[in-house]
Regions:
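Non-catalytic terminal/interface segments that mediate subunit docking, oligomerization
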Residues: 65, 270, 278-392, 397-407, ...
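Long, well-ordered, tryptophan-enriched scaffold segments
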Residues: 174-320
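Cofactor-binding active-site loop characterized by glycine-rich and histidine/acidic residues
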Residues: 24, 41-162, 316, 333-334, ...
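A glycine-rich helix N-cap at a beta->alpha junction
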Residues: 86-96, 161-175, 196, 403-415
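Peripheral docking tails and interdomain loops at the edges
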Residues: 299-303, 307-310, 420-422, 442, ...
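N-terminal amphipathic, basic-rich helices that act as targeting or association modules
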Residues: 1-80, 240, 244-246, 251-255, ...
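Glycine-/acidic-rich phosphate or pyrophosphate-binding loops and their flanking alpha/beta elements
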Residues: 260-263, 295-296, 305, 315-330, ...
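Structural signature of the thiamine diphosphate
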Residues: 218-286, 408-413, 432-481, 607-618
C-alpha cells in the first residue's frame, strides 16, 4: 500500500503522480474503516482528502503553518504527518485527539475546536513572522459555514494590514458562494491567478491614465462602476474589496490544479484567498447523501452507514425537541433560535412545525444572544438552544444586552458537563461559573427527562433571563415517581436520612443516587436533595440541615471555581451555619477527550469515588 510509505511529514513529496492517485483512495478507505470502529468526524474529512494532500505537497511542515478552522477536518493532515497508527485510539481517553493539538505534533501549529478562529490565528502567526524576521508561509483553512461567524469577518477586515504573504483557503463544500456565477466564473478563474490578474489590472489602468484628457476620467468611471458589474459575475469581489486577492474557484478533487494555484498564491505579497470547491462525504455513498449524519458519527456499519449501536432510549436533546414542539403549540410567543445547530440542538422539529418562528442566525452566538434580547424586548419569548462550550462566546451579550435589562430570554444549554470524545474545547464545564456571576440570571438543571420538560414550562412562564443546562447522552428516566412542581430557588427532597446531606445538581443526581446506595451498604443513611437551581439556590433548605446533619455534600458537573458548591460553601460560612461542606465538582483544569464514564472515574466524580470521599469526611 502507498499509505505505508507515509511515516512522517513531507513523505508525500516523494510519491509519483500514480502513487498520489492511489494514496487518495487509500486514505478514504482507511478513514471509512477506522471511523466506523471508533466514531468521529467522517463527512468533512472525506471532503478534504485531495485538498489536504495538495497543501502538504506545496508547503513544508512544520516550518510552514497550516491553521485548520474548527479542526474536525484535520484527519488526513494527521495521516500525512505520520499519525495513522493513532486512529485506533481516536477520541478515546489517552488516545489521539480528533482536533489539531500542538502537544501532539509540531505540524499542528495552533489548537482549534471552535469555529471561525483560523483567520485571526493565521494573521497573528503571519504578523509575528514580520516582527521576528522569520521566513515561513501561513495558511488558514476555513469552511464556508465558518464564514458565517462574525469573528471571521473581523479577521478578514484586518487582513489587508498584514505584511507579506498570507493565504486563506476557503473550503466551500456547499457551493453556496459559487452557484450563481456559472460558466463565467470558470472562465475567469483561468486568468485570475496572482501574477496574471494583478499585471492585467495594473496594465489596463496604466494604459488608460496615459490617454490625454479622457484617460483619467475613464479610470474614475471604471472604478465607480466596476463593483456593480463584477458582483454579477465574479464570486470573489467581496474579498477583493477588502484588499484580499481572490483566486478560484478551484476543483477540490484536482490535486494538480490546486497545487498550481497554491504555488501562485505563495507569490502574492499580501493576503490572498483560494476558493476551493469540495464535497462533503466524497467517496462514501451514505456520507454523500446524508453528510449531517456523518458529521460526528458514532461507530457504524460500513455497508449501510447505519449505527452499530441503535439507541433504545431518548437522549436529552430528543426530550428538549419534543418539549419545544409542545410549547410552540401552546404559546404563539415562543420562538426558537439556533447558531447553525438546528439538528444538533433538537430544534429541527420546531423549525418544521413553526418555520416563521424559527431563526438560524449562522455560527454567531454573540449575535444570537442580542438578537434574542431584541425579540424579548418586543414581547416574544425567545429560546436560544446552544451547546455550553459555544455559549462562552456570548458572555458580554448575556451580561450587557440580556441581564442588565432583565429580559425574558431562555438559554437551553445542551452538552452541559462532560461531553466525552470531542475533548477540552467542547467540554461544557464552565457555564455555571460564568453565568452565576451575572446578576438577574437564573440557572436550573433537571435530574431526569421529566424534570427537563417541567423546567422548560417553568422557564416560559418565568419573567427574566433563565438558563436550563442538561447533559449530552441518554436522558435519565429514574425517579419518575418524585415530581414536585418547579418553584424558583426551591430544591426537591428525594430521600430523608441523617448525618450527611447530599445536594446534587442536574446530571449528578443519578450519580448521587448510586452513591447513596453505596453509603447504605456501609451503614450510612444519607439525605438526598435534588438542588434544581444552581442560582439562586435553596437557602432555606440549607438552613434546616444542621438539626440532623453535620456534613453537606454538593455535587455538580462543573469546575469547582465559581460553581454551585463554591457558592453554597460561601453562603454557609458567611451565615455561620453549623455544617461542614464537601464540594464534589470537576477540577479546575481542561478535561481531555474520552468516554464520559471513564473521565468521571479519573476525575473522582463517579459514585464510588464520591462515597469514599464522604466516608472519609465523616
Amino acid at each position: 500500500m502507498v499509505l505505508e510509505k507515509i511515516q512522517k511529514e513531507n513523505d508525500i513529496k516523494k510519491l509519483t503522480h500514480k502513487e498520489l492517485e492511489l494514496l487518495k483512495d487509500e486514505i478514504r478507505q482507511f478513514l471509512i474503516e477506522s471511523i466506523s470502529v471508533t466514531g468521529g468526524h467522517l463527512a468533512s474529512n472525506l471532503g478534504v482528502v485531495e485538498l489536504t494532500m495538495a497543501l502538504h505537497l506545496c508547503f513544508d511542515l512544520p516550518k510552514d503553518k497550516i491553521v485548520w478552522d474548527v479542526g474536525h477536518q484535520s484527519y488526513t493532515h494527521k495521516i500525512l504527518t505520520g499519525r495513522k497508527d493513532g486512529f485506533s485510539s481516536l477520541r478515546q481517553y489517552g488516545g489521539m485527539s480528533g482536533f489539531p493539538k500542538t502537544d501532539e505534533s509540531d505540524c499542528d501549529c495552533f489548537n482549534t475546536g471552535h469555529s471561525s478562529t483560523s483567520i485571526s490565528a493565521g494573521l497573528g502567526l503571519a504578523t509575528a513572522r514580520q516582527v521576528t524576521g522569520e521566513d515561513y508561509h501561513v495558511v488558514s483553512v476555513i469552511g464556508d459555514g465558518a464564514l458565517t461567524g462574525g469573528m471571521a469577518y473581523e479577521a478578514l477586515n484586518n487582513a489587508s494590514s498584514v505584511k507579506g504573504n498570507f493565504i486563506i483557503v476557503l473550503n466551500d463544500n456547499n457551493m453556496s458562494i459559487s452557484e450563481n456565477v456559472g460558466g463565467i466564473s470558470q472562465y475567469l478563474s483561468g486568468f485570475r491567478t496572482a501574477d496574471a490578474y494583478r499585471d492585467f489590472k495594473n496594465n489596463v489602468m496604466n494604459s488608460l491614465n496615459h490617454i490625454p484628457i479622457y484617460g483619467e476620467r475613464m479610470v474614475k468611471h471604471i472604478r465607480n462602476t466596476k463593483s456593480s458589474i463584477k458582483q454579477l459575475f465574479i464570486p470573489g469581489m467581496f474579498f477583493e474589496e477588502m484588499g484580499i486577492i481572490y483566486l478560484g474557484p478551484v476543483d477540490g478533487s484536482d490535486i494538480k490544479e490546486m497545487c498550481r494555484v497554491f504555488d501562485e498564491a505563495k507569490r502574492v505579497d499580501g493576503p490572498v484567498l483560494v476558493h476551493v470547491l469540495t464535497k462533503k462525504g466524497a467517496g462514501y455513498g451514505p456520507a454523500e447523501r446524508y453528510p449531517s449524519r456523518f458529521h460526528g458519527a458514532e461507530p457504524f456499519v460500513i455497508e449501510t452507514g447505519l449505527p452499530k449501536n441503535k439507541r433504545t432510549k431518548a437522549n436529552y436533546t430528543d426530550v428538549f425537541s419534543t418539549v419545544m414542539k409542545k410549547l410552540g403549540e401552546r404559546n404563539p410567543k415562543v420562538v426558537a433560535i439556533t447558531a447553525a445547530m438546528a439538528d444538533g440542538t433538537g430544534l429541527r422539529r420546531f423549525h418544521c412545525n413553526f418555520p416563521d418562528r424559527f431563526f438560524d442566525v449562522g455560527i454567531a452566538e454573540a449575535h444570537a444572544t442580542t438578537f434574542a434580547a431584541g425579540l424579548a424586548k418586543a414581547g416574544l419569548i425567545p429560546v436560544f438552544a446552544v451547546y455550553s462550550s459555544f455559549l462562552q462566546r456570548a458572555f458580554d451579550q448575556i451580561l450587557h444586552d440580556v441581564c442588565i435589562q432583565n429580559l425574558h430570554v431562555i438559554f437551553a444549554i445542551d452538552r452541559a458537563g462532560l461531553v466525552g470524545s470531542d475533548g477540552e474545547t467542547h467540554q461544557g464545564i464552565f457555564d455555571i461559573s460564568y453565568l452565576s456571576v451575572i446578576p438577574n440570571m437564573t440557572i436550573m438543571a433537571p435530574k431526569n427527562k421529566w424534570e427537563l420538560s417541567d423546567m422548560m414550562k417553568f422557564a416560559v412562564a418565568y419573567d427574566g433571563p433563565i438558563a436550563l443546562r442538561y447533559p449530552r447522552g441518554t436522558a435519565y428516566d429514574g425517579l419518575k415517581e418524585i415530581r414536585q412542581p418547579v418553584e424558583l430557588a426551591k430544591s426537591e427532597l428525594i430521600k430523608k436520612g441523617s448525618r450527611v446531606a447530599i445536594m446534587a445538581l442536574g446530571s449528578m443526581v443519578k450519580t448521587a443516587v448510586d452513591a447513596v446506595k453505596l453509603l447504605e451498604a456501609e451503614g450510612i443513611s444519607a439525605t438526598l436533595i435534588n438542588a434544581r437551581f444552581a442560582m439562586p439556590f435553596d437557602k432555606e433548605a440549607i438552613k434546616e440541615l444542621p438539626a440532623e446533619h453535620s456534613l453537606l455534600v454538593t455535587m455538580e458537573e462543573n469546575v469547582q471555581s465559581g460553581g454551585f458548591g463554591e457558592h453554597v460553601t460561601e453562603y454557609v460560612k458567611t451565615n455561620g451555619i453549623a455544617l461542614e461542606v464537601l464540594t464534589v465538582a470537576l477540577p479546575d483544569c481542561y478535561v481531555e477527550h474520552g468516554n464520559v464514564e471513564v473521565l468521571k472515574k479519573e476525575l473522582h466524580v463517579d459514585a464510588e469515588s464520591v462515597a469514599k470521599r464522604i466516608i472519609a469526611a465523616l
